[in-house]
Amino acid sequence: MAYPTTNLTGLIGFAKAAKVTGGTGGKVVTVNSLADFKSAVSGSAKTIVVLGSSLKTSALTKVVFGSNKTIVGSFGGANVLTNIHLRAESNSSNVIFQNLVFKHDVAIKDNDDIQLYLNYGKGYWVDHCSWPGHTWSDNDGSLDKLIYIGEKADYITISNCLFSNHKYGCIFGHPADDNNSAYNGYPRLTICHNYYENIQVRAPGLMRYGYFHVFNNYVNKFQLAFTVAQNANVISERNVFGSGAEKKGMVDDKGNGSTFTDNGSSPAAVASKSPAAKWTASSNYSYSLMTTAAAQSWVVSNAGAQNSALKFPS
């Protein structure tokens, strides 16, 4: 079964700064069962773990992964993890997640029900993955999110991904507004070339404590986009806000020790309380910006898991 072999092509941002390699150069293991999947992603041996078929469980099932892994879905639809939640552990680091589809049942909706949960380790790249979501309503009681990156996880990039059809989107940083200085600076996270469609709040995310560089993303059908909470340091560049922007919910600024700067987004993302950022992304890595029009076109055509080939911004 064919699968993406682009390896480190397209690596960008803080993940590139950390020299993430995943399982590059290691053995290739194709898995077709949950038991084989659990075994292949564990430990520290350099491994490219290929989903040879989609995997589904009837109940929420947590799979802990180790380090030095590339976890990649095959083309042709053999790349779906349903009700399977990937979790870091204290020894996790240097992992690539690519061309995966994360699905979950509507009934799995508690606060900590999050399909990709990164709370330990340095160096992760989440690329060309999809979270298709499900139907939801304002009064359905759901508290689950799509992805969490926080605590001491660090040097991470989310690129070319699709997040859609969910009440809550993404949550980043130590998940409390308790001014806990132990978590200041975590995570360093790049969020670029992603497509957020019909996410009510937290797309691109609720941000706390870390350094967040967010550029060339398209957010459509939303109520609140950025939620800037405790001690977040956010740089937004040339993002596009579609339906929902007329309600001026681009930045939910809590004014709680954070900084926020927007450069050229359409329409502008304006923080009402937080002062300008005091750091620059370019001091950490090099990158190129698309125009907002080009960024919107790019993500609509190329973001998310793919059936035949992965494309990357030039």
Curated annotation (Swiss-Prot):
Miscellaneous: In most stains, pnl production is accompanied by cell lysis and production of a bacteriocin.
Induction remark: By DNA-damaging agents such as nalidixic acid, mitomycin C or UV light.
Domain of life where this protein originates: Bacteria
One of the record's GO molecular function terms: pectin lyase activity
Enzyme class: lyase
Organism expressing this protein natively: Pectobacterium carotovorum (Erwinia carotovora)
Pfam families tied to this protein: Pectate_lyase_4 (PF00544)
Enzyme Commission code(s) on record: 4.2.2.10
Catalytic activity: Eliminative cleavage of (1->4)-alpha-D-galacturonan methyl ester to give oligosaccharides with 4-deoxy-6-O-methyl-alpha-D-galact-4-enuronosyl groups at their non-reducing ends
Taxonomic classification: Bacteria, Pseudomonadati, Pseudomonadota, Gammaproteobacteria, Enterobacterales
Active-site positions on this chain: R202
Parts forming coiled coils: none
UniProt-listed Gene3D superfamilies: Single-stranded right-handed beta-helix, Pectin lyase-like
Homology family: Belongs to the polysaccharide lyase 1 family.
Keyword terms of this UniProt record: Lyase
InterPro entries named among the record's database cross-references: Pec_lyase (IPR002022), Pectin_lyas_fold (IPR012334), Pectin_lyase_fold/virulence (IPR011050), PEL (IPR045032)
Entry protein name: Pectin lyase
